[in-house]
Amino acid sequence: HQKRGPKKWSFDEFMDELKKGLSAEDFQEFKTFLDELQKTQGADIKAGRGKIPTITIGFGEKSNNDYPIGIYANGKAWISYKNVNTQPPKPILNEEKAEKIRALLGGKSRQWHEIKASSIKELLDKIKAVTKLILEEE
C-alpha cells in the first residue's frame, strides 16, 4: 500500500484539538488572537499538514505560499526563515526582518526554530510581536 504523508487538517479540527489541550481561559485568548489576526490586513491563516492539527500564518501575497509562522494544536509554535522544502532553501523573510525576529525570540541563525514560551499568553505575545514586525512597511 502507498505511504501517506502527514494529514491535511481543517481549521475546525485545529480549534477542536486546541480546546481539548488548553484551559478555557487560554483557549479563549487563543481564539481572540486568531479572530483578530483573521481581520488583519496582510495576514492569512491556513490549516496545515502535520501529525497533529496545525495552522500556519502567512503574510503579504496569498499567491506566495510560504507561511513563516506555524502553530500546533498542542500550543507549540515555530517560525521559519527559509522554505526548507526548496533546493536551495528559499528565504521567506528578508534578512533584515529575520535578524530582528531572531533577536526578539532569541533564535539562532538556523532556518527555523521553535518559538519558546512558558505560557500561552507569552506565546501569543511573541507571535503578535513577530506579526507586527513582519507587517511593518519596508
Each language-model region and where it sits:
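Charged, low-complexity intrinsically disordered regions
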Residues: 108-138
